[in-house]
Regions:
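Conserved Rossmann-fold NAD(P)-dependent oxidoreductase catalytic core, especially the SDR/UDP-sugar
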Residues: 77, 81, 102-143
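NAD(P)H-binding glycine-rich loop region in Rossmannoid oxidoreductase-like domains
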Residues: 52-96
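Conserved glycine-rich Rossmann-like NAD(P)H-binding loop of the short-chain dehydrogenase/reductase
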Residues: 25-36
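Conserved catalytic-core motifs of eukaryotic protein kinase domains, centered on the activation segment
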Residues: 40, 85-92, 127-131, 180
């Protein structure tokens, strides 16, 4: 399959790209222009055979339609402005990320994708003093959590309107190579 991936150099993104390539898929990794983390996608110092790197701002994902000749099957949207701790409370940055995600859905349709997969966050649920699962009521406690939940609701609706399958991967505490030393797992 041909898979477009935003957020490809993020902690989760690098692992996802590696796994997709290992499974024989062609990956179109969308990176910020002059990304300082582009080398995370290299294998043995080289760009893997089935990997195409495309530099594009998250706010301009529609430009991919004119830049890509290949038909794409899946759009994996992990890119997000303001995912870092200092920006999670900035409602303006978070709203821009919501609009980026909805434009990513439209771009996915224009590229011929059948599926759109978005990575959500435990922040959608807010704080609960009980065991959590997908049935628990969402009560986000930050602009970041509110924005991720807004994308889940609006992108799913937009995908239905555009006849795209929608997938929502709500990510809770991940860990592994390259994890931040201040992450939940690393500090336990």
């Amino acid at each position: 399959m041909n898979i477009v991936v935003t957020g490809a150099t993020s902690f989760v993104g690098t692992g996802a790209v590696k796994e997709l390539l290992d499974r024989g898929h062609c990956v179109f990794a969308v990176l910020r222009e002059n990304s300082a983390k582009a080398d995370k996608l290299l294998q043995n110092g080289k760009i893997p055979e089935n990997l195409t790197i495309l530099e594009e701002d998250l706010g301009n994902l529609g430009n991919l339609v004119n830049r890509m000749e290949e038909h794409c099957d899946v759009f994996l949207h992990m890119g997000w402005r303001g995912a870092g701790n200092s920006s999670r409370k900035d409602a303006g940055i978070q709203e821009r990320s919501v609009q980026d995600a909805l434009n990513a859905v439209r771009t996915a349709k224009a590229l011929g994708c059948r599926r759109f997969l978005f990575t959500g966050s435990q922040a959608e649920y807010g704080v609960h003093n009980t065991l959590m699962d997908e049935t628990i009521t969402c009560r986000p406690a930050s602009p970041y959590g509110e924005a991720k939940l807004k994308v889940r609701r609006e992108a799913e609706k937009l995908c239905r309107e555009l006849s795209l399958d929608y997938g929502h991967a709500c990510i809770f505490s991940t860990y592994g190579p390259g994890d931040h030393p201040w992450s939940l797992i690393s500090t336990c």
